[in-house]
């Protein structure tokens, strides 16, 4: 059982006490199946990205064995082409409810594996997971376009969807950097990954026209920052430009404008993005503003709140919402592994392409 002593570093004024943090971790553990799968909640589906985020939160809370089981579930049920399906009913690997294979879902394993290694120093774990990391990266990079962006999925029949999503590609950028860190640790250079990472970063920084227009979604606003492609003054300018458009003071972050709906996951990710920019005070304010989503009985968090109607919606207590909040708190609390995978200055950057005369960095 998770004790408050194991979650003392997850204490944050106005956000979590040690007891509350331990309660939240127990809530995620209660959702996890014996085989390691972490669905959104029991009876709902599992997707590989949110499963990984919840596992990272378990590592941040010191629940390393449970996190390892989550990653081993992914390794056991990886498709021969290196992918995972988009949805599994209640985390049952034999009950696939969406046979699409989304690139950002598949890439995120590398973030979780590197985070687990930094949390534990477990070389044997890294050895076991390396083949799955390699296969997943190769699946993802097979959909990279000539302009650097990543096509967002393969259809169930294998047809590639070459259109790219800015949020998904930004998440993939972080994942590729973590994959390069794993390769460096293993002393197995991956020059093709370095080129792919640099090309993707350039597309995110300099070519918005290469991505589908999802400007209404808050994730497209902050993910280039959270994924590490956009840094420095350009990142700060982007944050300020749409702040009033997406942030609802005292309530959290809109998922999509103009809907009057704030969501816990987006709010926690924005807080992480602010931490990346060195704006910990504003990150804390965002996390404090979403405590109205906390369910005191389970320790988990409601997905969202429609503030015009003063209504929780949907009425779902998701493992990944709790996971995102724990990770944001862990970063603000200085958890070394969490800081390393989200801080832009602690991961390999890849090789910038010679294109447009653009600078290699994100300034």
What are the language-model segments listed below?
Residues 1-49, 60-88, 134-135, 140-147, ...:
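Low-complexity, Ser/Thr/Pro/Gly-enriched N-terminal "stalk/linker" regions
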Residues 2-14, 52-66, 108-125, 170-187, ...:
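Well-ordered alpha-helical scaffold segments within catalytic/enzyme domains
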Residues 5-7, 15-16, 22-23, 47-48, ...:
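Extended ligand-binding clefts on enzyme/binding-domain cores
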Residues 10, 43, 56, 98, ...:
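Generic anion/oxyanion-binding catalytic loop in active/binding sites
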Residues 12, 47-51, 55-144, 287, ...:
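Aromatic-rich carbohydrate-recognition surfaces in CAZymes
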Residues 28-31, 61, 74, 81, ...:
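Alpha-helical solenoid scaffolds that mediate protein-protein interactions
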Residues 43, 84, 230-239, 256-266, ...:
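CBM-like carbohydrate-recognition segments
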Residues 85-99, 151-164, 246-249, 305-311:
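Acidic/His metal-coordination segments adjacent to aromatic residues that form catalytic metal sites
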């Amino acid at each position: 059982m998770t004790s408050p002593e194991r979650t003392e570093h997850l204490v944050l004024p106005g956000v979590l006490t040690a007891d509350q943090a331990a309660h939240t971790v127990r809530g995620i553990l209660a959702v996890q199946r014996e085989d390691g799968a972490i669905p959104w909640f029991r009876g709902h589906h599992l997707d590989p990205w949110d499963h990984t985020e919840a596992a990272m939160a378990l590592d941040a809370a010191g629940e390393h064995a449970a996190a390892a089981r989550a990653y081993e579930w992914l390794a056991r049920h990886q498709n021969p082409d290196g992918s995972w399906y988009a949805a599994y009913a209640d985390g049952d690997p034999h009950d696939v409810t969406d046979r699409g294979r989304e690139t950002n879902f598949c890439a995120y394993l590398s973030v979780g594996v590197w985070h687990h290694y930094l949390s534990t120093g477990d070389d044997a774990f890294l050895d076991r997971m390396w083949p799955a990391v390699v296969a997943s990266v190769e699946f993802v990079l097979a959909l990279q376009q000539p302009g650097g962006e990543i096509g967002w999925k393969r259809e169930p029949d294998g047809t590639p969807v070459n259109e790219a999503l800015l949020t998904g590609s930004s998440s993939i950028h972080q994942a590729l950097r973590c994959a390069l860190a794993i390769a460096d640790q293993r002393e197995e250079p991956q020059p093709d990954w370095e080129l792919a990472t640099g090309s993707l970063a350039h597309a995110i920084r300099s070519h918005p026209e290469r991505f589908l227009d999802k400007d209404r979604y808050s994730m497209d606003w902050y993910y280039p920052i959270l994924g590490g492609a956009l840094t420095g003054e350009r990142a700060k300018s982007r944050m300020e430009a749409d702040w009033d458009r997406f942030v609802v003071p005292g309530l959290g972050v809109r998922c999509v404008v103009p809907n009057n709906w704030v969501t816990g996951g987006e709010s926690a990710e924005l807080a992480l993005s602010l931490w990346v920019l060195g704006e910990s005070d504003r990150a804390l304010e965002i996390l404090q503003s979403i405590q109205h989503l906390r369910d005191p009985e389970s320790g988990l968090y409601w997905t969202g709140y429609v503030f015009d109607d003063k209504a929780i919606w949907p009425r779902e207590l998701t493992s990944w919402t709790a996971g995102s909040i724990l990770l944001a708190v862990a970063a603000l609390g200085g958890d070394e592994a969490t800081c390393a995978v989200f801080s832009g200055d602690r991961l390999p950057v890849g090789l910038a392409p010679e294109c447009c005369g653009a600078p290699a960095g994100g300034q």
